[in-house]
């Protein structure tokens, strides 16, 4: 297994724990956190009621707009969904998968 595969496996396992310290440490080992992986982290922040959630949510929507062909209506939709996390995760995953 490559070191990146190993790092990504650790990251995936950390997400299942919901432990933000483990998640942050594992994410720091990755060369880049994908938009979908960033959403997974955002969902954990929402579940935990973490005070960093709002800023992280704004950054995530910004990434959505720059990394996908999303437009203004998608941005409004994404903001509405992000405010309802973790309930609307599937719809947000769908937006993140657009290429």
Predicted regions: what they are:
Residues 1-99:
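Long, low-complexity, acidic Ser/Pro- and Gly-enriched intrinsically disordered regions
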């Amino acid at each position: 297994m490559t070191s990146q595969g190993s790092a990504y496996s650790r990251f995936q396992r950390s997400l299942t724990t919901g432990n933000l310290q483990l998640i942050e440490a594992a994410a720091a080992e990755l060369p880049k956190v994908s938009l979908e992986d960033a959403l997974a982290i955002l969902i954990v922040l929402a579940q935990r009621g973490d005070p960093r959630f709002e800023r992280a949510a704004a950054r995530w929507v910004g990434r959505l707009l720059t990394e996908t062909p999303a437009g203004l209506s998608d941005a409004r939709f994404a903001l509405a969904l992000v405010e309802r996390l973790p309930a609307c995760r599937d719809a947000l995953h769908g937006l993140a998968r657009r290429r």
